[in-house]
Amino acid sequence: AYQNGNKIGYSQTSAMLTGLKKSDDFAFLKAVDSIALQQSLRDLDRGFVNFFQKRAKHPQFKSKHSHHQSYRTINQSNNIRIVGKYIKLPKLGYVKVRQSMEVGKINNVTIEHTPTGKYFAVLNIEFEPQPMNNKGGKVGIDVGIKEFYSDSNGNVVYNPKYLEKSMRKLMREQRKLSRKEKGSKNRNKQRVKVALVHEKITNQRNDFLQNESTKLIRENQTICIEDLKVKNMMRNHKLAQHIGSASWSKFFDMLTYKSVWYGNDIVKVPTMYPSSQTCSCCGFKNPLVKNLAIRKWECPECHTKHDRDTNASINILDKGLQMQSA
């Protein structure tokens, strides 16, 4: 259609869906939540718009055989609500849930089926964040691989490296999976075991990131970070796995949305700013420190001894405060 100059958007696909529902071959569509079907068409339309505007890759076909499935539906006329230990969903009725927190007004819900066989209801809600009485501090953050981050106060948080610690077990379970016959029950059981290892790593990493980001938000009013282009850094194949495992982007995202909730200030220092090479005491720029192998150095100008990451975090704080006051 695109090559022939024809455009198919949400309106056209919605009309096609109506026709399919009337067909005997697709009668099962009537048993599905109609709002969820419309949402999938809107998502498809948005995906192609982003693709043609070069903001995203071509939308991928989602196979019904995939072990990760999800759908989203909108709350209309209170058709989605929490009642005691149950959640009411369109077409499904009341489903028992384990609720992790109190919820406000529900806008929409995404039902996810994970590769480990678990179901999650992810709620999009409206709530009024309560102001957080932080300590009013100001801090600069320099992220790394061995040390997850060093701050301008001299604190160092080490990278827990959950993926690396679980790699041996993950490889063992994956080898067992490769030996199972495709389509067999034993292969499916082993697939779940592999998925459980991945799920544990993800949960550990998310818990760590949530705790560290919340701690920084509680203790500081202003947080200065580098505006890292993580996607470009991932092109370094020697470091890509370690950078991905550290999840810097997700950490920065958490700091950003929590700062919006609680009124903190996040200042992003330009990537090209030489924070590691500049002496935080006298401002002398030492080009030799560009070598990542140098972890400690002495300033030739003022003879101050520096830890590479702590010095960088102090410079990031100073540059961020300078940008904030400009």
Specify the residue positions occupied by each region the protein language model found.
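N-terminal, Lys/Arg- and Ser/Thr-rich interaction peptides
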Residues: S11, A15-M16, V230
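An alpha-helix initiation/capping motif
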Residues: S11, I35-Q38, R42, A195, ...
